[in-house]
Amino acid sequence: MIDIKDLTMVYNGRAVLDNVNVSLSQGQIVGLLGENGSGKTTLIRILAGLERNYQGDVSICGNRPGSLTNDIVAYQPDHLPLDENLKIEEVCSVYSIFYDDFDSNKFYKLLNSFEISKELKIKECSKGMKEKIQIALTLSRKAKIYILDEPMSGIDPKSRKIVLNTIIDNFDYQGLMIISTHLVLEVEKVLDRALFLDNGKLVVNESVDDIRENHHMGVEEYFTEVL
């Protein structure tokens, strides 16, 4: 579904991505892990079609990221600017107009699972509630690939388990999901594969099962050791 060959991106004389090569097939939840400044967000923005000034080849279902992949990829940035004065149900209506593949019924089902009222205005929601709304909006698209950038950074630890269970319950294994996060311990239980970025270089690309079997440690411990 995603093929990346010799991907390099230089910004202000610094390689924020340095000769990255990786192929990702369907049926996986992939963790994109790395410290701040490692290149995670840049890679995600390239896959979302928001960054074009790079060298190398990037293919999503045979197409270069951009207008031809907008219906394939559902992208959730680390901060989604929502009109603070809109009610949640009005945001849902906007998404229904903007995305042909948006499922309003699914959105309200997810919203209910998070115990959030559709009558609330965005400005009445906490940071954690806003992130849950963003997750519900993203998962309610009928996309082939879902890319979530730090989806739980503002969610309290107790609610993270609920969010992760929601992600698992709504993941179609005919598709692909990439979760970029620094919360390695929380997400490792849902991951099939882990990618570690360090200073723009892809230093680890292994299945979670192989990490546990070959290195005799969990993803977080391995992440700490490698980086």
Feature names for model-found ranges:
Residues 33-35:
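The feature captures the beta-strand-to-loop junction immediately N-terminal to the Walker
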Residues 205-206:
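ABC ATPase "signature
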Residues 48:
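Helix-to-loop junction immediately C-terminal to a conserved catalytic motif
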Residues 55-69:
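Conserved ABC transporter NBD signature motif
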Residues 146-150, 155:
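Catalytic Walker B motif of ABC-type/P-loop ATPase nucleotide-binding domains
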Residues 78-133:
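ABC-family P-loop ATPase nucleotide-binding domains
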Residues 2-4, 17-19:
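Conserved structural motif at the start of ABC-family nucleotide-binding domains
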